[in-house]
């Protein structure tokens, strides 16, 4: 049996905001059928104002339109490159480029992360919702574990009822594997800050909205922990890079929680192997051995990915 490792997250109608449940089912039902022919942010915000009065509903509707109608296109990276001689010229070109990106994103329905974030920010501005774009580093794959910090992504934070709502419309729109696969998801909407930090590290750390500071180096060394309800300290090894010689001799993995299904793991070959579990209460441990070279280890709870490690 073979599985391609991707970040699999559940799409939910109800979002849990820091322990409080808010029912978005009505908003989603209406916004899902918004026209895909809108050509400006003003058309979108005007429609949202007609349908919803609460800021949290308006924000959800705006996010819904963006993730359902904008396709990820890496060629957009090359569209807005420019040169400048002095800072004033740079600032003017940046402002002009920003407007061009927003217009092109809505009109042509394609963008990279910058277009997704800027367009949603502009719609929020027209809805009088306080929102701002965040630039930072993200982990998409095990190959991102251990590398230096890079400002390679943009997402957005809105402040509603004095609470930050963290969201990534780019990741929420779908995934890109050779081409764009449209898969609108709320898995990256109103994400719990400590879970978001597993994969998104802001350039200005205050934008993480977590109590305890985490260094860029620590973020870089974390493994990829997928499920929202599992904390980093519930899994051992805690470092995301493991040595092949340790894997060859037998690497012990410990989970401080009870898996829902049979634990499986896979290497580069994609073949799922069943783990020989040793359980003690809700905790479980097992040993993984590799007979040949591999660049990664991915552990699954049934068909749901739990954690991934880079092997060197």
Q: Each PLM stretch: what is its role?
A:
Residues 1-22:
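Bacterial Sec-dependent N-terminal signal peptides
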Residues 12, 39-43, 118:
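A generic alpha-helix surface/boundary motif
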Residues 20-109:
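Secondary-structure boundary elements
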Residues 51, 145-147, 244:
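Residues embedded in well-ordered secondary-structure elements
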Residues 115-196:
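Hydrophobic/aromatic-rich core segments of domains that either
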Residues 177-312:
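Alpha-helical and coiled-coil interaction segments, frequently adjacent to or embedded
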């Amino acid at each position: 049996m073979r599985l391609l490792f991707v970040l699999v997250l559940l799409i939910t109608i109800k979002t849990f905001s820091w322990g409080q449940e808010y029912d978005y089912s009505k908003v989603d039902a209406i916004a899902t059928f918004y026209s895909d022919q809108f050509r400006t942010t003003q058309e979108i915000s005007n429609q949202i104002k007609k349908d919803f009065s609460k800021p949290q509903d308006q924000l959800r509707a705006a996010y819904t339109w963006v993730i359902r109608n904008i396709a990820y296109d890496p060629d957009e990276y090359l569209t807005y490159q420019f040169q400048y001689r002095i800072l004033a010229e740079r600032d003017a070109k940046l402002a002009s480029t920003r407007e061009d990106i927003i217009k092109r994103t809505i009109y042509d329905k394609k963008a990279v992360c910058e277009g997704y974030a800027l367009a949603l920010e502009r719609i929020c501005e027209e809805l009088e919702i306080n929102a701002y774009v965040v630039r930072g580093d993200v982990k998409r794959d095990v190959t991102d574990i251990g590398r230096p910090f890079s400002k390679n992504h943009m997402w957005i934070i809105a402040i509603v009822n004095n609470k930050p709502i963290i969201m990534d419309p780019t990741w929420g729109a779908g995934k890109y594997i050779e081409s764009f696969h449209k898969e609108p998801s709320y898995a990256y909407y109103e994400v719990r800050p400590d879970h978001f930090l597993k994969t998104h590290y802001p350039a200005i750390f205050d934008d993480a909205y977590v109590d305890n500071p985490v260094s860029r180096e620590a973020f870089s060394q974390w493994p990829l922990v997928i499920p929202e309800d599992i904390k980093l300290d519930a899994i051992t090894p805690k470092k995301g890079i493991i040595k092949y010689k340790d894997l060859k001799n037998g690497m012990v993995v410990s989970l401080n929680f009870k898996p829902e299904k049979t634990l499986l793991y896979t290497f580069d070959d994609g073949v799922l192997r069943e783990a020989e579990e040793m359980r003690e209460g809700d905790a479980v441990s097992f040993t993984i051995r590799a007979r040949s070279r591999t660049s990664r280890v991915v552990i699954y709870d049934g068909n749901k990915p739990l954690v991934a490690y880079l092997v060197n």
